[in-house]
Amino acid sequence: NKSAKTIKEELSYINEQALFADGFDEALVGIDQSDYVAVYDTDKCIDILMQKIGMNQEDATEYFDFNILGSYMGEYTPRFIKIYE
């Protein structure tokens, strides 16, 4: 797996206007090649909120849905995906 640093460097080279979700580097999983934006794992984002901020799962999910998933910062807003293994 590529590190968040490598993904950020690669994406910034391809699309210098790409935006990243602050504090969620551990959840950065790739690049959407159709729009060249950052792609994050939703479950990992929620885990980060639970671990680093101390929220329970319900609060972390609600916070993520409203404040992160629901925010639109323009054309290069990151994408969030649910990964099923």
Predicted stretch roles:
Residues 1-85:
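C-terminal alpha-helical interaction appendages
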